[in-house]
Amino acid sequence: ITMPDNKLAHVNSTPQDKAIKKIFAKLEKPVQTISLYDALMQHRQEYVYYRTDHHWTSKGAYYGYVGICEKLGISHALSEYKKKKFGSFIGTYYGDTNGDKNFRKDELAVYYPVSDKISMKYQNESGKIVNGHVIADSSKYGISNKYLAFLEGDNAYTVITNKNIKDSSS
């Protein structure tokens, strides 16, 4: 999505929009799909993917969220969220280059809802269910682990409870 069209023509890869359509076509009928390709393409000149990592930035995730909300008929403005910056971040691509000093570090910023009614539990590495944070303070992590700010990292099992939601959608 973020690669300029003139460079994309020289990459031996299937265009993302075609790959998404092919995957969606293979899914069974009960599966409902939402493509976020167009939502992200509208913002491709912005910082929607990290330079040093394969994940999208919080701003990119917000645009994806807006794409989902549009399909569901709901909306939440970015102004409804608090923004917190956690400083410099270097991701997977940086490690893949053996720490090439030419890489510009990314900046990790997160947007989170202003609510004390959201809680999270997850299964830690020992298999124990523990309390956690949807957005954790990543200042305690090293520069290459800042992404652990989101849901306390990649866990086998996570449950998020939002007491603000009164229907069965949560």
PLM region spans:
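Extracellular glycan-modifying ectodomains
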Residues: I1-S170
